């Protein structure tokens, strides 16, 4: 029986112990005999498991401890080796530094010697400088006196100029008053002439009216009889007229509404502008405030930055001092170490030598003793003498040996004493080193704090800089916003002006339209006179503010009565634009030619300038040499005169003369010797100076070379130290690699343990085979006992090993303590050396400063020399530039005079041509006036003829004056050319001299600069070497400190590791116990899970079967759902299309019915009014043509030609006048420049002549030398400042580098630590993964054995089942919703069908009405055509006559041009002859000519204005009014006709759409409807093309009108400014005639030119603004029209897409049949013939497009765009013409069909194939399911 004393876990433990399965033990448990055996087995199994676990734990712990101890030993050994290597390196560096210091001391002595010599030189230079300063002070006093005199003269000149200006102002005012009087008189005369002309016209009109009244009275009698008959007709027509009046009133109200809307828009725009201005002002104020605040912030930041910079400088100074102290200490320490090492080495060598000698003496003594013993044994008798001799020798040798040993002993004592002394010195040095290290440690926290402060300040500076940059960015953004607002404001202003103009034009148009409506209502037909009166009334209605250009635009461009008038206006504008462009090109050609001529003259002038400069240089050289010779000869003459005075007055004149000659000769020789001696002394002084400078430079170079050698040695040492450091780093890397290898080996051992466990399991399985052999179990038990004994022995051994390890650890700790003590001692020594090195570095820095000061003094001297040379060069350059400017001005004057001459010649030719032309014109006018005005009593044109004759006389006088002026200018030109040649010669001489001096001085400067650069480079190299050495020492110090810190951290880490190891051991033991308990619980849970797993497998199988059933049901439901969904989607699409079409049709039909009713009323009323108007027009036209043709035909044409000709001449004269003004400006500028150059040259010559001659020539080199010294001294101060600033920057950068290095080191340490942690974690993760994978494999193997299912799969299957059930429920709800929606759709379709039937009835009624209207309309059209054709024939005849007249006039113009060319040639010949014979003309005569010319031009302008006014009055007197009225009526009829056609087309399209959607109608009706829809689409395209063309023409006309407005405004501005320029020129000329002073003339001319320049600049700016505004407006309008065309194109593309969709639907007739059958199940389906796909789609889309775009623009742009996109050719569109059909209904013919290319067909085929492929996949299941349903339906049919 089973006993309850053990558990299942005990049984499992026995099974694992015996390697027997539980199935075999379970039957044995029921046996009582087995229970007695099982109890001891359970206890043994438990013991076995505990021993096994303990063994594993001990092995793991032992291995870990061994590895840790080995690692620690390796690390300690490596660190010890590193410290020893560093100590050796420091000793080597100390020895090198000592040598370096010795060399520096020697160089320092040489530098001091050089300084003393330089000081003596500086004192001599200072004395010379003082003398120079005194001389400069005297010269400055003279200059000040002269300047005062000049200022007095300038004040006098200014007073004279003011008086002159006041007098000129008074003269100008008088002239102005005279001109105003003359203009008033001319205006009065002109108005009288106008009044006389008007009176004559009114008298003619009265006579004509009296004649017409008589004819009208006769007709009234006949009409009175007919009136009684027509009263009955008029009563019926009154009702129609009332209706027409209502329609017109509606139009008027619509126009007034538009006007009010435009006013509202204008007001809104004004309000928006005011708001924008307010916002702009507010934003401007806010921006100013922000800018001020940002400025304050920036100032605060700058102050903070300055404070920070001061603090930084303080920190840098403190850090520099610390570094210097450390370097001095280090250097001293290294020196001491080197001395001690040398002493130790020498002592060791001596000791070794002494030891060798002592050993050799001892060996000799041994040999002697042995020999004595040997000789004692030998017989004394035979060898007595020999023994005696041997003994003597041996004794002598011993004596010698004893003496050498004593000497050695004494030397040994002496060296021992020295050794002790050296040891004492070493101890003393160590104490000092320790003291220095303590001081460094004390100052270390202070240094750290300073570094922290420095870092903090740097962060603050960075933050401040970022804020400053942000503020700058904000300022820039604010500025950009401000600019954007300004541009917006300008745009709004321009838009505002544009809207104002539009409102004015609209008001004008509205007034004209209202007037014409009133006339039409009253039935009044206006004639020529009445139109003139209306125009005068319109002109009076304009405001006074509007200019003449605005009146012209409002009367000619804004107001129009027909489309023809608009087209004519546009054509006129285009022709005017082309003419203007041609004229601009012609006007620009002479400017380009003049520019090329000016360029050539400039090139020649430059060449002459170069020649003049060369001549000037040569002349200046000659002057210098001549001055020197003159001074020399003066000195000789003075000396000779003194000798003559001193000589006695003897009678022998010959003797006196000989004496005088001899004495003079001797004196001259003495003087020459003195001069030569002085030159030699100066040369010697200069040589000495140069030698001294060279010596100083050589000494500095030697110092530099020495320093470079020392630096190279230091760099080599540094490289060696770096190599050693690299080796140490490599050793550390190797140690880390060894650590990693050990970790890997540990992992491999763990894997081996796992593999061994697996092998143990295999062995246990093998043992299970031998379960039958129970007898062997006893032997196994014995073996186990023996194994337990072995385990106990192993435990004892492990304990012994642990004790040994602990002892080793203690020894290691002791070694560590010793190492720390050694490290501390080495640190103390290191600090001592650092202090000594710092002191030495300070000394060296002082030496370097002294050397730098010497170098700076030398560089100052060099700089002074360079500055003096540059000063001289600048003076020469100024002289050269002045000469060049003078020459250029002379050349400009010459060119100006040439251009003036050419212009005068051109003017004379033109005036002669005009004279001839005016004479001919006068003759023609007189002949015409005599022929035309025989019947008239008065002759108003005589005044004009007289004025023209006066003008001719004046022009002749002007020609004479111009020729005289031409000759005067030629003489001036010749004189100026001569002066130019002289100036060129002098300029060239001066240029040669200046270039020679400049070249010599530049060579000197280059040599001095090269020397200075070399010195600066040397100094920089020395600085860099010093900085590098200081950096290396600092790095070494930091490394030593780090090593100390690392040693301390190592100690702490070791203690932590030991404590952690103890903790880990305890925690591992606890974990082992916990794991044992967990294993037991897991085993029990595993058994229970196996049992539950069997149950779940059965449930899973059941669930799988259920899931398969549910899945099959789901697939069936899904297939049904997809079928129904596809059917529903198709039905929805069809229903939506039908609904939209029906709604559109309903709305369009309602609108159409209302429109038809209104149109019927309008047609009736218009028909009656047209009949009346035609009769009245026929009567009036017959009478008017006979009367007015004879009177006005001749006058109108002549006047028009005169006006056009005079306008053309006026424009030409204006352009020429502007060109002459520009040329005059250029000439004036050139004259001024030449005069200024002449004045400057004269001043220079006077200055050179008045220069005083210096007697003291000996002092000149000293003065120049002192000036050079002073200049060098001043320049050297600048270099010092720059040097100090650069040194500060270098120090700051060095500190930043050090900080970065300091921050990098801890980061690297942290990175290494993190890497180590990551490696440990990755290893632990890998172990856990392996452990997990093993457990999973084991679990799966168990499941596979027992054939059970995984619980994770079970959970996944459950989730899938739940999701499928949710989907099933959702599909059911969707099916219910779709069924409800289908019911609602069916109801809506039935209601729509009822509405369609009602609409059909209404359409039939509308068709009957349309047939009646069409018949009446056709009759009216035919009548109108006949009447209009007759009128047009008459007009064509008139046009042909006018064309003939034009051709004849063109021939006359050509003949006139030929005569003009011949006159030009003759005029040119006359000018050439007149240039030789003409005399000079005074300025007063020239001014008179100009004044007369201006008067004639004014009179011409007045006459032209009068002619233009007459022409504007005569233009409206033509017989165009009747034609315009007819055209207007025809246009209205056409518009009504097109409206009817559109309405009919809309109705037909709607009917087609209804028939298309109603499935009960026949196929023949569908074909007719498709044809109608095609025609309707083409008609809509044509209609929209026409509308687009009209809109484009209107836009173009608007743009042209705006351009003309701007052009006229600019022309007015130009005329005003040209008048102002003329006035200024007159003022300048009068002033020049009255004043004689040339300087005053120049001032006046300058003022005039400045004003002209300002006016021209302002005008150019305004021109640019106006042009930019016009361009902007035109671009904006073009963009608006482009947007409209794009919208139309997009709509067309949408329509075409809908057509394609309908084609696709029609391509599947079976599907359409099925969809229709589903909608209408009760109605039978009839067979349809297949219609064309494109026709059906077009019908559907045309109806929708006609409804969507009733008021849109033309469709031509859209059709073109779509054609380009899809490769469709543009169709040949023909206008639809309504015809009267046989059936009584309207039909449209002439509509062209769209011709599709092969490309379009291919593309459509590809699209259909792609859609078919995409739809075929969706419909495969539908086809399978529909097979059965379709067969059943066929059977039912």
Curated annotation (Swiss-Prot):
Region named Disordered: 1464-1521, 1602-1642, 1700-1837
Main location: cytoplasm
Single GO MF descriptor: structural constituent of nuclear pore
Compositional bias (Polar residues): 1468-1479, 1700-1730, 1753-1763, 1795-1814, 1827-1837
Gene Ontology cellular-component annotations: cytoplasm; nuclear periphery; nuclear pore; nuclear pore nuclear basket; nucleolar peripheral inclusion body; nucleus
Highest rank taxon of the organism: Eukaryota
Keywords, in A-Z order: Coiled coil, Cytoplasm, Nucleus, Phosphoprotein, Transport
A Pfam family assignment: TPR_MLP1_2
Subcellular localization, as worded in the UniProt entry: Cytoplasm; Nucleus
Purpose: Functions as a component of the nuclear pore complex (NPC). NPC components, collectively referred to as nucleoporins (NUPs), can play the role of both NPC structural components and of docking or interaction partners for transiently associated nuclear transport factors. Active directional transport is assured by both, a Phe-Gly (FG) repeat affinity gradient for these transport factors across the NPC and a transport cofactor concentration gradient across the nuclear envelope.
Name of protein: Nucleoporin nup211
Organism field: Schizosaccharomyces pombe (strain 972 / ATCC 24843) (Fission yeast)
High-level lineage: Eukaryota, Fungi, Dikarya, Ascomycota, Taphrinomycotina
């Amino acid at each position: 029986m089973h006993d309850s004393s053990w558990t299942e876990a005990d049984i499992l433990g026995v099974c694992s112990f015996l390697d027997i399965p539980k199935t075999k033990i379970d039957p044995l448990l029921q046996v009582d005999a087995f229970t007695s055996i099982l109890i001891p087995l359970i206890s043994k199994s438990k013991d076995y498991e505990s021993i096994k676990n303990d063994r594993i734990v001990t092995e793991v712990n032992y291995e870990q401890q061994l590895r840790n101890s080995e690692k620690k030993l390796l690390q300690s050994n490596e660190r010890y080796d590193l410290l020893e290597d560093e100590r050796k390196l420091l000793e080597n560096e100390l020895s090198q530094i000592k040598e370096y210091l010795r060399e520096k001391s020697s160089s320092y002595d040489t530098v001091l010697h050089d300084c003393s010599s330089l000081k003596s030189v500086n004192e001599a230079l200072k004395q010379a400088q003082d003398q120079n300063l005194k001389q400069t002070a005297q010269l400055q006093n003279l200059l000040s006196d002269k300047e005062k005199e000049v200022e007095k003269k300038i004040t006098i000149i200014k007073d004279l100029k003011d008086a002159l200006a006041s007098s000129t102002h008074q003269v100008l005012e008088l002239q102005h008053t005279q001109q105003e009087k003359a203009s008033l008189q001319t205006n009065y005369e002109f108005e009288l002439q106008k009044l006389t002309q008007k009176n004559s016209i009114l008298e003619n009109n009265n006579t004509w009216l009296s004649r017409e009244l008589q004819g009208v009275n006769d007709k009234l009698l006949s009409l009175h009889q007919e009136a009684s008959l027509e009263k009955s007709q008029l009563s019926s027509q009154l009702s129609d007229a009332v209706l027409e009046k209502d329609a017109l009133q509606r139009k008027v109200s619509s126009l007034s509404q538009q006007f009010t809307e435009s006013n509202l828009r204008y007001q809104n725009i004004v309000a928006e502008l005011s708001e924008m201005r307010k916002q702009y002002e507010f934003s401007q104020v806010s921006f100013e405030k922000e800018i001020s605040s940002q400025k304050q912030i920036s100032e605060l930041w700058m102050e903070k930055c300055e404070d920070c910079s001061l603090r930084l400088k303080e920190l840098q100074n403190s850090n520099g001092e610390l570094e210097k102290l450390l370097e001095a200490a280090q250097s001293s320490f290294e020196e001491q170490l080197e001395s001690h090492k040398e002493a130790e080495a020498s002592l060791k060598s001596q000791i070794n030598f002494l030891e060798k000698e002592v050993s050799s003496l001892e060996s000799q003594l041994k040999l002697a003793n042995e020999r004595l013993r040997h000789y004692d044994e030998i017989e004394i008798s035979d060898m007595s003498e020999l023994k005696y001799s041997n003994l003597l020798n041996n004794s002598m040798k011993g004596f010698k040996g004893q003496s050498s040993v004593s000497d050695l002993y004494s030397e040994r004592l002496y060296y021992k004493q020295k050794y002790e002394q050296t040891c004492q010195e070493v101890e003393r040095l160590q104490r000092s080193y320790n003291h220095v290290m303590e001081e460094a440690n004390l100052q270390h926290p202070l240094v750290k704090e300073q570094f922290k402060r420095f870092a903090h300040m740097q962060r603050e500076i960075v933050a401040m800089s970022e804020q400053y940059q942000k503020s700058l960015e904000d300022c820039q953004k604010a500025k950009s916003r401000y600019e954007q607002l300004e541009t917006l404001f300008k745009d709004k202003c321009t838009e505002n002006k544009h809207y104002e103009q539009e409102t004015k034009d609209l008001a004008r148009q509205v007034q004209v339209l209202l007037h014409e409506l009133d006339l039409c209502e009253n039935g009044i037909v206006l004639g020529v006179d009445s139109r003139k009166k209306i125009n005068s009334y319109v002109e009076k209605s304009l405001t006074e503010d509007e200019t003449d250009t605005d009146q012209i635009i409002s009367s000619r461009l804004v107001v129009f009565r027909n489309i023809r008038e608009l087209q004519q206006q546009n054509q006129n504008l285009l022709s005017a634009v082309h003419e203007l462009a041609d004229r601009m090109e012609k006007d620009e050609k002479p400017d380009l030619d003049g520019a090329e001529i000016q360029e050539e003259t400039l090139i020649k002038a430059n060449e002459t300038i170069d020649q003049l400069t060369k001549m000037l240089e040569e002349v200046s050289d000659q002057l210098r040499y001549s001055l020197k010779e003159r001074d020399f000869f003066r000195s000789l003459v003075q000396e000779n005169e003194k000798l003559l005075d001193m000589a006695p007055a003897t009678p022998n004149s010959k003797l006196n003369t000989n004496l005088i000659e001899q004495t003079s000769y001797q004196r001259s020789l003495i003087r020459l010797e003195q001069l030569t001696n002085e030159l030699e002394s100066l040369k010697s002084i200069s040589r000495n100076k140069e030698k001294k400078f060279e010596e100083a430079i050589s000494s500095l170079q030697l110092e530099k070379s020495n320093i470079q050698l020392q630096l190279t040695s230091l760099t080599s040492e540094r490289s060696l130290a770096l190599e050693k450091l690299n080796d140490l780093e490599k050793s550390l890397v190797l140690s880390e690699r060894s650590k990693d290898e050990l970790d890997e080996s540990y992992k491999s051992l763990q894997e081996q343990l796992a593999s061994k466990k697996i092998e143990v399991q295999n062995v246990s399985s093998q043992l299970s085979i031998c379960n039958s052999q129970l007898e062997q179990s006893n032997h196994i038990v014995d073996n186990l006992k023996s194994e337990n004994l072995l385990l106990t022995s192993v435990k004892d051994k492990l304990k012994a090993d642990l004790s040994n390890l602990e002892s080793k650890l203690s020894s290691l700790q002791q070694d560590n303590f010793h190492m720390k003590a050694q490290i501390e001692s080495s640190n103390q020594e290191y600090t001592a050396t650092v202090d000594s090195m710092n002191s030495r570095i300070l000394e060296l820095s002082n030496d370097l400063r002294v050397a730098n000061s010497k170098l700076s003094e030398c560089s100052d001297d060099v700089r002074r020399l360079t500055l003096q040379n540059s000063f001289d060069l600048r003076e020469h350059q100024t002289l050269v530039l002045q000469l060049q400017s003078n020459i250029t001005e002379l050349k400009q004057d010459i060119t100006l005079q040439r251009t003036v001459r050419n212009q005068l010649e051109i003017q004379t030719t033109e005036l002669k041509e005009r004279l001839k032309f005016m004479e001919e014109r006068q003759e023609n006018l007189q002949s015409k006036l005599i022929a035309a005005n025989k019947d008239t009593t008065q002759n108003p044109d005589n005044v004009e003829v007289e004025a023209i004759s006066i003008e001719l006389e004046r022009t002749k006088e002007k020609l004479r004056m111009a020729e005289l002026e031409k000759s005067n200018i030629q003489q001036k030109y010749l004189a100026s050319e001569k002066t130019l040649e002289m100036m060129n010669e002098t300029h060239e001489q001066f240029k040669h001299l200046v270039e020679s001096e400049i070249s010599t001085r530049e060579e000197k400067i280059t040599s001095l600069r090269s020397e200075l650069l070399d010195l600066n480079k040397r100094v920089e190299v020395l600085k860099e070497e010093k900085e590098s050495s200081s950096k290396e020492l600092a790095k070494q110090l930091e490394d030593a400190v780090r090593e100390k810190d690392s040693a301390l951290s190592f100690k702490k880490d070791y203690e932590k590791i030991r404590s952690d190891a103890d903790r880990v051991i305890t925690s591992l033991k606890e974990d082992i116990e916990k794991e044992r308990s967990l294993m037991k619980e897991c085993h029990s849970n595993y058994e229970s899970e196996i049992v539950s797993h069997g149950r779940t497998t059965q449930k899973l199988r059941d669930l799988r079967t259920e899931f398969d059933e549910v899945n099959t049901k789901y697939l069936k439901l899904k297939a049904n759902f997809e079928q129904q969904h596809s059917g529903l989607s198709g039905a929805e699409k069809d229903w939506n299309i039908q609904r939209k079409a029906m709604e559109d049709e309903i709305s369009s039909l309602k609108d159409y019915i209302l429109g038809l009713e209104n149109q019927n009323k309008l047609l009736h009323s218009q028909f009656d009014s047209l009949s009346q108007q035609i009769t009245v027009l026929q009567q009036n036209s017959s009478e008017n043509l006979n009367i007015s043709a004879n009177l006005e035909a001749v006058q109108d044409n002549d006047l028009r030609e005169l006006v056009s000709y005079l306008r053309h001449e006026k424009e030409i004269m204006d352009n020429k006048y502007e060109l002459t003004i520009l040329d005059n400006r250029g000439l004036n500028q050139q004259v001024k420049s030449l005069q200024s150059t002449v004045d400057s040259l004269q001043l220079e010559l006077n200055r050179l002549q008045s220069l005083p001659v210096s007697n003291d020539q000996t002092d000149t080199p000293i003065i120049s030398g002192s000036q050079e010294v002073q200049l060098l001294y001043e320049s050297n101060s600048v270099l010092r400042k720059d040097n100090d600033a650069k040194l500060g920057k270098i120090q700051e950068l060095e500190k930043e580098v050090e900080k970065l290095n300091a921050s990098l080191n801890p980061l690297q340490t942290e990175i290494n630590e993190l890497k180590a942690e990551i490696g440990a974690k990755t290893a632990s993760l890998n172990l856990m993964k392996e452990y997990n994978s093993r457990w999973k494999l084991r679990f799966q193997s168990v499941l596979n054995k027992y054939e059970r299912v995984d619980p994770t799969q079970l959970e996944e299957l459950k989730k899938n089942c739940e999701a499928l059930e949710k989907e099933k429920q959702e599909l059911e709800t969707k099916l219910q919703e779709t069924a409800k929606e289908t019911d609602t759709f069916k109801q809506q379709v039935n209601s729509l069908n009822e509405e369609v039937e009602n609409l059909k009835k209404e359409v039939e009624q509308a068709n009957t009405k349309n047939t009646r209207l069409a018949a009446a309309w056709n009759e009216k059209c035919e009548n109108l055509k006949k009447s209009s054709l007759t009128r047009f024939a008459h007009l064509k005849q008139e046009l042909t006559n006018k064309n003939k007249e034009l051709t004849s006039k063109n021939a006359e113009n050509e003949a006139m041009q030929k005569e003009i060319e011949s006159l030009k040639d003759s005029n040119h010949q006359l000018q050439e002859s007149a240039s030789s014979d003409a005399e000079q003309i005074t300025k007063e005569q020239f001014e008179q000519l100009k004044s007369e010319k201006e008067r004639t031009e004014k009179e011409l302008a007045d006459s032209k204005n009068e002619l233009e006014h007459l022409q504007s009055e005569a233009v409206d007197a033509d017989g165009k009014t009747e034609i315009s009225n007819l055209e207007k009526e025809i246009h209205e009829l056409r518009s009504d006709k097109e409206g009817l056609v559109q309405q009919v087309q809309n109705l037909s399209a709607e009917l087609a759409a209804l028939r298309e959607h109603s499935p009960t109608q026949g196929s023949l009706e569908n074909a007719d409807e498709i044809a109608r829809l095609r025609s309707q689409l083409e008609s809509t395209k044509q209609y929209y093309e026409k509308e687009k063309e009209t809109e484009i023409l209107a836009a173009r006309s608007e743009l042209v009108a705006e351009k003309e407005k701007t052009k006229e405004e600019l022309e007015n501005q130009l005329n005003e400014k040209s008048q102002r320029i003329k006035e200024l020129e007159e003022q300048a000329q009068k002033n020049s005639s009255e004043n004689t002073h040339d300087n005053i003339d120049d001032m006046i001319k300058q003022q005039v030119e400045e004003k002209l320049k300002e006016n021209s600049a302002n005008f150019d700016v305004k021109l640019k603004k106006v042009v930019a505004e016009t361009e902007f407006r035109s671009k904006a309008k073009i963009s608006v029209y482009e947007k409209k065309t794009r919208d139309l194109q997009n709509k067309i593309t949408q329509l075409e897409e809908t057509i394609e969709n309908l084609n696709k639907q029609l391509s599947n007739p079976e599907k359409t049949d099925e969809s229709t059958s589903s909608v209408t199940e009760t109605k039978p389906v009839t067979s349809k013939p297949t219609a064309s796909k494109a026709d059906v789609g077009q019908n559907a889309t045309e109806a929708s497009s006609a409804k969507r775009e009733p008021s849109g623009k033309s469709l031509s742009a859209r059709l073109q765009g779509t054609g380009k996109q899809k490769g469709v050719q543009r169709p040949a569109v023909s206008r639809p013409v309504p015809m009267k059909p046989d059936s009584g209904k309207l039909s449209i013919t002439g509509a062209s069909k769209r011709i599709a290319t092969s490309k379009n067909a291919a593309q459509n085929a590809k699209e259909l194939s792609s859609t078919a492929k995409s739809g075929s996949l969706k419909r495969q299941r539908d086809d399978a399911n529909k097979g059965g349903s379709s067969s059943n339906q066929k059977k039912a049919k």
